[in-house]
A protein has these predicted regions:
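Eukaryotic intrinsically disordered, low-complexity regulatory linkers and tails enriched in Ser/Thr/Pro
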Residues: 1-74
Length: 74
């Protein structure tokens, strides 16, 4: 489960930041920047995390305007 501070839209640890790359198609245009600075597409992140639910929750939250997430540690 992704927990987001609704007021500040941030959380204390293990962040990823989601942002849009307008030059790419929809799925590959949603990028994830992890706390260590790694950037990958959201699809790649979901595969790396091996959790489709995480991917779905990110997409839902992003649609609500939330772009910084506290990701569960494996």
């Amino acid at each position: 489960m992704i927990i987001v501070d609704q007021e500040n839209k941030t959380i204390l640890n293990n962040y990823i930041e989601i942002f849009i790359n307008d030059s790419a198609d929809c799925m590959n245009g949603i990028l994830a920047r992890t706390l260590d600075g790694t950037i990958c597409t959201l699809g790649e992140y979901a595969r790396l995390s091996r959790t489709q639910m995480v991917f779905n929750e990110i997409v839902e939250a992003y649609a609500k305007g939330i772009s910084v997430f506290n990701m569960p540690k494996e």
